[in-house]
């Protein structure tokens, strides 16, 4: 019984870890020549529901275009 509980606990933890970073897809660097409207348009062209510009998670000084998957 304890092994079944441990299995489900590990399964849930692994599922959360694997899916937490899949919501957004990094697409392009945002700069004055590629703004939020361009980001949204390009993401929609590639089949995503939309896109937005935000600071990069690794290098916050760089603004990146992220395409949403939901």
From Swiss-Prot:
Keyword Nucleotide-binding (UniProt): no
UniProt superkingdom: Eukaryota
Signal sequence extent: 1-23
Keywords: Antimicrobial, Disulfide bond, Fungicide, Plant defense, Secreted, Signal
Disulfide bonds: 30-53, 39-65, 43-67
Swiss-Prot/TrEMBL GO biological process terms: defense response to fungus; killing of cells of another organism
Stored InterPro entries: Scorpion_toxin-like_sf (IPR036574)
Key word Signal present: yes
GO-annotated cellular components: extracellular region
Location(s), subcellular: Secreted
Family in the record: Belongs to the DEFL family.
Protein name as it appears in the record: Putative defensin-like protein 280
Annotated source species: Arabidopsis thaliana (Mouse-ear cress)
Lineage, top ranks: Eukaryota, Viridiplantae, Streptophyta, Embryophyta, Tracheophyta
């Amino acid at each position: 019984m304890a092994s079944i509980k441990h299995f489900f606990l590990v399964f849930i933890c692994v599922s959360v870890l694997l899916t937490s970073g899949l919501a957004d897809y990094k697409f392009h660097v945002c700069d004055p020549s590629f703004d939020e409207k361009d980001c949204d348009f390009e993401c929609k062209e590639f089949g995503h529901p939309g896109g937005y510009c935000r600071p990069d998670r690794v290098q916050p000084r760089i603004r990146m275009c992220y395409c949403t998957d939901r």
